Each structure stands twice: as structure tokens, then as C-alpha cells.
Design a protein with these regions (language model features):
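Well-ordered beta-strand positions in beta-sheet-rich domains
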Residues: 20, 66-72, 88, 102-104
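Envelope-exposed proteins and targeting segments
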Residues: 29-31, 67-69, 85-87, 167-169
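Second-shell loop/turn segments in exported
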Residues: 102-111, 135-139
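Juxtamembrane "anchor/assembly" segments of surface/extracellular structural proteins
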Residues: 1-50, 56, 90-96, 158, ...
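Short beta-strand-centered interaction patches in the first periplasmic/extracellular domains
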Residues: 77, 86, 93-95, 130-206
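Short, structural beta-strand-to-alpha-helix junction motif
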Residues: 111-114, 144
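Short, acidic/charged, Gly/Pro-enriched secondary-structure junctions
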Residues: 1-10, 40-78, 113-124
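Residues forming anionic-ligand binding surfaces in small-molecule and nucleic-acid pockets
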Residues: 89-100, 104, 117-131
Length: 216
């Protein structure tokens, strides 16, 4: 069982406890996390965007920590409620770095595999079903590397995932055996709180802390 109390956040922010937590991993999208936490004091928000954040899970009755999420902070909202400093933080997996600049490339070798092309573009790529020759020249035109890799995975009949636990850019397509990180089924498993709740919190509204699971 996962509880908000078992989640620890390591970043420039000094988050002492997590109140609410939302994590979503979907095929073809960057993994994302939104959380609300309590702060020891107000941070320098100006330097937070693009900072790394590591989120660990400590399971009930076990002192060992497992990596739940490792990514890049996208937005930070701090506020004070009832005299307590709080933060609402959102972050995306490191794969977001592949999705910032459109590029043009050509791959003319028809015997090159989808996996080989994707590794040339994104580096650490793995998964089933990608070791298939394209059979035709491949063009990347006005696509980010993320968009291109997603299209390449689809060309091989697979869907693309970003590894939520890796501090570096790491992608896989199809099925993959994993170990050493917190385990989640690969296909559309979410640990959520309703996103409207965070808008309510940023407006100073109160609501009982909660956590729920969603399988799509």
C-alpha cells in the first residue's frame, strides 16, 4: 500500500512532508507528478524551475527507499495557509529535454532498425519489438526528438514510455523487465488526486487529504 506519508521528496525545496500526490505514466507522454507538500521555510522560487527532483517511496514496515520518480521541475507555487508554508510542485520526466527543439534529420539506410535510429537520436532506448528494419529511408522534419521517437515506436507497432525513475533520459517501447525501482504495471497505471484539488489549494480552499489509484 502506498501512502502520502511514505513519500519523500529530495530537491532544492526543503519539503518536510507530502500531503497530496498525483503521478501519471501514459504511453506516448512524459511521465508527470504533481504534489502538495509542507515547507520548512519559503524558498527562492526563481531558481526552482528546471531543477531536478527525486521522489522516493518508503513502503509500510520497510525502512528501505525505492525510486518512485526522478524528473525536472516545471512549476512551483508557494503559499501560506494557517501559518504553514506549503508548495504545489509539478514535474515531468527527464524525457522533456527531448521535447524542446524541433530538428531535421535523415536516415537513409533501409536496413537500419527502429531501435538503432531511436538510440542514435535519444541514446538510452530499449524494449521489445524495435529490432525491426525500417525498410525505407526515414526523415525527421520539424519534429522534436521526442515526437520523432514516438513516431518511430509507432512505426514498429509499439508505444513509447519515458522511464519515471531514471535521472537521465531513458525510453522504452513495448514490454520491459525492470528491477530496483518501485513497481507499476506498464500500461496506464496512475496514483492520483483530482487535479482540480490543486487549483482549490492554490486559491486557499481547504479539503481533506486523500490519495487514490486509477487503472485505465
Amino acid at each position: 500500500m502506498i501512502s502520502a506519508a511514505g513519500i519523500k521528496v529530495y530537491s532544492y525545496l526543503n519539503i518536510t512532508a507530502v500531503a497530496d500526490f498525483f503521478m501519471e505514466i501514459k504511453p506516448g507522454e512524459h511521465g508527470r507528478v504533481t504534489l502538495r507538500g509542507y515547507l520548512a521555510g519559503m524558498p527562492d522560487v526563481g531558481r526552482l524551475q528546471e531543477e531536478a527532483v527525486r521522489i522516493m517511496l518508503q513502503e509500510d514496515g520497510d525502512n528501505r527507499e525505492q525510486v518512485l520518480f526522478h524528473g525536472i521541475i516545471q512549476s512551483v507555487h508557494t503559499f501560506v495557509e494557517n501559518g504553514v508554508c506549503q508548495v504545489i510542485l509539478s514535474a515531468l520526466t527527464s524525457s522533456i529535454r527531448l521535447d524542446q527543439e524541433e530538428r531535421n534529420r535523415s536516415f537513409q539506410k533501409t536496413k537500419e532498425t527502429y531501435l538503432g535510429i531511436m538510440r542514435e537520436v535519444a541514446g538510452n532506448v530499449s524494449g521489445s519489438g524495435l529490432s525491426v528494419e525500417t525498410g525505407v529511408p526515414v526523415i525527421q522534419y520539424r519534429e522534436t526528438d521526442w515526437e520523432f521517437c514516438r513516431r518511430m515506436a509507432a512505426g514498429a507497432g509499439q508505444v513509447l514510455y519515458a522511464d519515471p525513475a531514471s535521472p537521465e533520459i531513458r525510453l522504452w517501447a513495448g514490454l520491459e523487465e525492470k528491477g530496483g525501482t518501485a513497481s507499476f504495471p506498464a500500461d496506464r497505471y496512475s496514483v492520483c488526486v483530482d487535479e482540480t484539488y490543486y487549483h482549490m489549494k492554490s486559491a486557499g480552499e481547504g479539503k481533506k487529504e486523500f490519495l487514490y489509484y486509477r487503472t485505465e
